[in-house]
Every structure is written in structure tokens, then in C-alpha cells.
């Protein structure tokens, strides 16, 4: 896939370094990521799509990809949504999308092999992973994600050198204390997950071809306008 890099860069107007506007968006992401970094079951938060590729527009939102602990995907999504809603930085719809956070892609740490949701010759998915910029990276979650996707021809030595320039520090002792504090809440949530969500999952699981929307116990993907096929055909033409 690396052979298509020049065409991909031209197609999306990707810059070698971020503009001042994009740097401010990264600073905003770092700021609000600190407000959620205490969540023990949050393993990685990364910027993806246009901002990670340095190809934003003045109306761009901030797309986030979030990795959670196994069986905690709905719990983490709930907390992040509430916190971002309180700070008024959650992208609810098109009317407030500019510069706000789009919480449209979550995955559990035990299901990071995206070859399962790739289309044939998935050029966009390759570069989506290639340019991913982690902000929160607990227990080497980003490295584990890359290792899980080597089947998609991802090569570590070809990743942009600045991919990890935006990672914020997370104090482990605070996470441990909060884990104890939230022990009961976690137990109660896991009880609901095991006894209620699993019963409902056959009815709630939803996958639209070609993986535009995925709602399951391990992946939540809410992009209802997936253009990967269109992008692939344009670049391969």
C-alpha cells in the first residue's frame, strides 16, 4: 500500500507538518483528554482522519478512535460522552461539528485486528492506521494496535516519525486509586453487561456493508458515510 502514498497525499492535500490551526486542535484534544485520562478502562485515545493527516478544513471536526478494556466499551463511551457533553465539546450532529470531538469509533483491546472490517484493497484503512496519532497511550496500546494490523501491510519503520509527538502523560498511581474507587461501579456495570447486554446483543448487533456502521460488544463504528470504496477506486484509477 505504501506505493500509493504520493497519490493518497495529493488526493487529500496532506501536509508534511501541521498548520497553526491544526496545532491548536491538537492542543484542544490534549486538554480535554486529560479530563478523561483517569478512566481506568480507557486504553488509548487517538486522533484520526483529517487532523491526523494534517489535511483539515476550517469546518473540520476532531475524529477520535478509542480503545477500551475488554467488556468495557459501552461503559467508557458513556463516561466520555457525558464529560464532553458537559464541556460542550461533543459533536452531536452537523450543526455543531466544527472543532468539536466526534466519538464515532471504539474498539476493545481484544479485537484490534481491522483486517476483519477491511474492504478489498483498503487503501484508506491502511493510511488511517498509518497516520493515527495517539494522545492517550496506556500500556503500549498503540503499539499493540499496530502489531495487530501487520496483516494490512502496516510497517512500523514506515510510520510518520511525529505520530507519537502528541501523547500526554497519565499518572499510574492516580489510575490505581480511581480503579479502587470505581470498583463497585465497575462490578455493577460488568454485571449488567454479562446478564443484560449479552441477552440483547443478538438483537442489537448491527453491521452494514461495507462496514459503515458496526454495533457490537467489541466494536462501535458510527460512520454512516463510509467512502472507502470510492477512495480506493479513485486512487487505483
Task: Label each PLM-derived region with a short phrase.
Residues 1-59, 68-237:
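Catalytic core of pol beta-like nucleotidyltransferases
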